[in-house]
UniProtKB/Swiss-Prot annotation:
GO biological process: autophagy of mitochondrion; cellular response to nitrogen starvation; cellular response to potassium ion starvation; piecemeal microautophagy of the nucleus; protein localization to phagophore assembly site; protein transport; regulation of autophagy; reticulophagy
Residue ranges of coiled coil: none
Keyword field contains Protein transport: yes
Family label: Belongs to the protein kinase superfamily. Ser/Thr protein kinase family. APG1/unc-51/ULK1 subfamily.
GO molecular function: ATP binding; protein serine kinase activity; protein serine/threonine kinase activity
Active site: D149 (proton acceptor)
Protein name as it appears in the record: Serine/threonine-protein kinase atg1
Taxonomy of the source species: Eukaryota, Fungi, Dikarya, Ascomycota, Pezizomycotina
Intracellular or extracellular location(s): Cytoplasm; Preautophagosomal structure membrane
Residue ranges of every copy of the Protein kinase domain listed in the record: 6-315
Length: 928
């Protein structure tokens, strides 16, 4: 397949959204890597992030950074043409260290510098790679860039530069890569006869001044700095921790800290107390070990800083043990290219909408997927080897004159959108126990603790304070949603910990009848029915989509690999503001199971089903509190399960009510509009790509958006509480306070059932939360769009929003009309449903539907009364000394409590009537 000046060859890797091919420059025969990204799989936000990522890398030319050579966009794909690294990545290099002597490109290296039996790589090779890595990092730091995902999988290797000058020798390179710039394959440091290292995957890279602090959780867990794992603000020193872990792995052969899950990983780092141990037979020098220990300091203030790192003797000094043939000459031949002297010119033409050839980009959106072991270049055989190709690499003759070189002053790079947080980043136990109302305060305390020591200490106090304030302003936009993101990470970490706990898994095997609720692998793949990814552009919906999650088995591969998934970021600052606006609390987690709450509904319009669709697979989940009396005394564990399930069920009822509003905002697909039978089943696909609202007026759109938003936020709060209660239970369980006497077989069986049921709820809550966040973001955008379309004199028009009425400090603050609250909407709806059910009951119409309506009304009113205490008081049990409880006046709460009691009475009477009718039915059939 031809792509402009390149011919696409065999596939060498595949990711979630992209396929990587080996390619060759048509005229010169030099090799490239071509990543083809399928645009149909990208939502708008992922496209924007990809563009920003390309934009931030424009003008970055360095021999130890993988170059983006060209970028061509067609109607269906984006093709990224990158430098080809024939030796794969450093992780494969270390993994296959015992077979490097058989590879044509590394045979000579192993002959001169054999790998020691007690370590991973020869120290000469280790120091060589470290020098080249530090050269690239210094280049980035001079431009205020932080990579944020340094790991062996993102360090790509090319054959030694000398192999291109070996003629027809045994070590000569047969796959000559296309050059991104003049010095692409001329090392800035290190040994010319050893493989060339290049940093790839700038998916997490962003501009970060030296005194600024970031908060976004990103990176690969095994190599992630502890301050990121602790959800604290961090600076560029986070990269140095990652360098320390990579250096340790090159020396020892494995990462310094390993665990089965992220929570345990952080615990091991903390438990180690900066005592980095090496195997007794490890031959690494004291200088290397000292550097590793200086880099792997838990406290970033104590950690080696960049100037000290760049000036370390291991970086600046000669390499001990280097053979005479490899000793550096007086002047490095950086300008000498291998092969012939003639340089074929690079064409100036571009096909499609392409980025200038100077554009830089890392290898791909999903590095570890694309460069998997199966796609290692060592196993690749090019379809068309460039046997007669000039050995001189091309690509530098047509470099734009304005292309910045390394010697030029640092450029001003745009600040890219914040990167994705890993779906299973760890959450500390104390964070799981923390109440939502104190989360922001306590996190702010931890940030302040760190930020005091982060800037350079040699600056005057006043200047230091000034820079701290400026740094805080620089990341203020990020902080708005990072709190939500951290909450999301905590919840998902807890859900993963629970799902993969040996005790829970043991419970699953002993109590299989409980039936785990399976959850789908991806968000978009399971629910394309309500919103297309092109329209739902919010970060909130993208927290954890696109990667496989664990169901009831322990698959942890994705835990230690960064995956963009279907969407690269987590909850947005706007969602955070919406949450603040509507409930005063911050929530975040992610998921959405393919539930059928919209099927078989009776009223109101758009197939709203008043009965909760909360999953009750195999009777493992209980719904209580609807008037039925408890027949047995419940132990503490069973009560906990009931409280969690009740809270989740209430959230499901609120979610169903919000769906009514949401679906009216989405135009029906043409097939549903023309098919009457399809209109009765709203689980069909909806087209959200259009910008029209059907027959809705602007006022109606704004009203529906406001109501849907506050209802979704209420559902989020209930889901968050369910997870908090489960977190408290799990903490007690880990302290041995939950299951009782382990010797008792009955207690053990009960504990297994409890663990299984709670795990089912936790996984369901995680999935539902992601769906709610996704839809809340869509509604938020609809609300903003609708408010802008209102007449200028309308109270809800943005020009009429006062500073005091808006929440947040950004340009995307959300303002809802006065009186629009979830509690009022829920109360009115419950009252309407109960009245309609009472009328039908009196007339004897649809008694089964009356029962459903009564139960749903009770659940909705219980949600109004729900408090934030964990484990908290039940509905109706309120501290009467408070004038206001969760935004509801005490007098109003009493009215709601009385209404709940009244509906419970009607429900009991109705069920007695239904029982009598059920007994009569068999008798009547016999008589017939």
């Amino acid at each position: 397949m031809s792509l402009g000046r390149y011919t696409r060859l065999d596939e060498i890797g595949r990711g979630s959204f992209a396929t990587v091919y080996q390619g060759v420059h048509t005229k010169t025969g030099t090799y490239v890597a071509i990543k083809s990204v399928n645009l149909s799989k990208l939502n708008k936000k992922l496209k924007e992030n990809l563009s920003s990522e390309i934009h931030i890398l424009k003008g970055l030319y360095h021999p130890h950074i993988v170059a983006l050579i060209d970028c061509q966009e067609t109607s269906s794909h984006i093709h990224l043409v990158m430098e080809y690294c024939a030796l794969g990545d450093l992780s494969l290099f270390i993994k296959r260290r015992d077979t490097l002597g058989d590879h044509r490109y590394t045979r000579d290296m192993i002959a001169k510098y054999p790998n020691p039996p007690g370590g991973a790589l020869n120290e000469v090779v280790v120091r060589h790679f470290l020098k080249q890595l530090s050269s690239a990092l210094k280049f980035l730091r001079d431009r205020n860039l932080i990579h944020r995902d340094i790991k062996p999988q993102n360090l790509l290797l090319c054959p030694s530069p000398s192999s291109y000058r070996s003629g027809a020798g045994s070590g000569a390179a047969t796959v000559v890569p296309f050059k991104g710039c003049e010095d692409s394959f001329n090392p800035a440091t290190g040994v010319d006869s050893l493989p060339l290292l290049k940093i790839a995957d700038f998916g997490f890279a962003r501009s970060l001044p030296a005194t600024s602090l970031a908060e976004t959780l990103c990176g690969s867990p095994l190599y992630m700095a502890p301050e990121i794992l602790r959800y604290e603000k961090y600076d560029a020193k986070a990269d140095l921790w990652s360098v320390g872990t990579v250096l340790y792995e090159m020396v020892v052969g494995k990462p310094p800290f390993r665990a089965t899950n992220h929570v345990e990983l952080l615990r091991k780092i903390e438990k180690g107390e900066d005592r980095i141990k090496f195997p007794e037979d490890n031959p690494a020098s004291d200088a290397i070990k000292a550097l590793i220990r200086a880099l792997l300091k838990r406290n970033p203030v104590e950690r080696l800083n960049f100037p000290e790192f760049f000036e370390n003797e291991v970086i600046t000094g000669p390499i001990p043990g280097l053979l005479a043939d490899d000793q550096p000459s007086i002047s490095r031949h950086r300008s000498v290219d291998p092969g012939t002297t003639e340089v074929p010119p690079r064409p100036d033409s571009r096909s499609g909408t392409s980025v200038p050839s100077g554009t830089r980009r890392e290898r791909e959106v999903n590095r570890e997927d694309v460069y998997s072991p199966r796609s290692s270049p060592r196993n690749q055989k090019p379809s068309t080897p460039p046997t007669s190709t000039p050995m001189r690499r091309v690509g530098s003759t047509d470099r734009p004159p304005s292309a910045p070189k390394e010697s030029e002053p640092p450029m001003a790079y745009p600040q890219r959108p914040n990167a994705v947080s890993h779906a299973t980043a760890p959450g500390r136990q104390e964070l799981l126990d923390r109440k939502a109302t104190t989360t922001a305060i306590e996190r702010q305390r931890s940030r302040n603790t760190y930020s005091e020591g982060s800037p350079r200490l040699d600056q005057p106090a006043d200047k230091l304070k000034e820079e701290q304030e400026r740094a805080a302003q620089d990341v203020a936009f990020e902080r708005d949603y990072v709190v939500v993101e951290k909450r999301a990470v905590e919840v998902n970490a807890f859900a993963d910990e629970l799902a993969h706990s040996p005790r829970i898994q043991g419970g699953l095997s002993r109590a299989a009848q409980a039936g785990a609720i399976s959850r789908r692998a991806t968000v978009q793949g399971a629910t394309p029915t309500l919103s297309s990814p092109q329209t739902t552009t919010g970060k909130a919906m993208q927290v954890f989509s696109g990667r496989s999650r664990a169901d009831s088995t322990h698959h942890r591969q994705a835990s230690y690999e960064r995956r963009y998934g279907q969407s690269p970021t987590s909850a947005t600052s706007a969602i955070s503001k919406a949450l603040n606006m509507a409930s005063g609390r911050l929530f975040g987690m992610g998921f959405s199971p393919p539930l059928t709450i919209t099927k078989g509904g009776r009223s109101p319009p758009l197939a709203y089903n008043p009965f909760p669709a909360y999953p009750t697979a195999h009777g493992s989940l209980m719904i209580i509190g609807d008037g039925a009396k408890s027949q047995v005394a419940l132990d503490e564990d069973t009560k906990t399960v009931q409280v969690i399930e009740e809270c989740a069920t209430r959230s499901d009822v609120v979610y169903g009510f919000a769906e009514v509003k949401y679906k009216q905002l989405i135009p029906l697909a043409p097939s549903i509009q023309t098919d009457p039978s399809a209109k009765s089943n709203m689980s069909g696909v909806r087209d959200t790509a259009g910008s029209t609202d059907g027959d809705l007026t602007v006022d109606a759109t704004v009203t529906l958006s406001e109501e849907a938003l506050v209802l979704y936020v209420k559902a989020l709060s209930l889901l968050a509480k369910s997870m908090d209660i489960a977190g408290v239970w799990w903490t007690r369980k880990n302290r041995g306070e939950t299951f009782g006497d382990p010797v008792m077989s009955r207690a053990d069986t009960t504990g297994a059932l409890v663990g299984t049921r709670i795990n089912n709820v936790v996984q369901w809550v995680r999935n539902r939360f992601n769906e709610v966040l996704e839809k809340a973001e869509f509604v938020r955008l609809k609300l903003i769009e609708g408010q802008k379309r209102l007449p200028p004199d309308h109270p809800s028009h943005p020009s009429n929003h006062s500073v005091t009425s808006s929440l947040g400090a950004g340009s995307t603050d959300i303002v809802v009309s006065s009186g629009v609250t979830a509690e009022k909407l829920m109360y009115d709806r419950a009252l309407e449903m109960s009245r309609a059910a009472a009328i039908n009951e009196l007339t004897g119409e649809d008694l089964a539907g009356c029962e459903i309506a009564y139960v749903t009304a009770i659940r909705m009113l219980e949600a109004v009364l729900e408090d934030d205490e964990v484990p908290g008081l039940g509905p109706g049990k309120v501290d009467t000394s408070k004038d206001m409880y969760d935004g509801v006046p005490a007098e109003d709460r009493q009215v709601v409590v009385k209404l709940v009691s009244s509906i419970r009475g009607r429900l009991q009477a109705l069920r007695k009537k239904l029982a009598i009718l059920a007994k009569r039915a068999p008798t009547a059939s016999v008589n017939v």
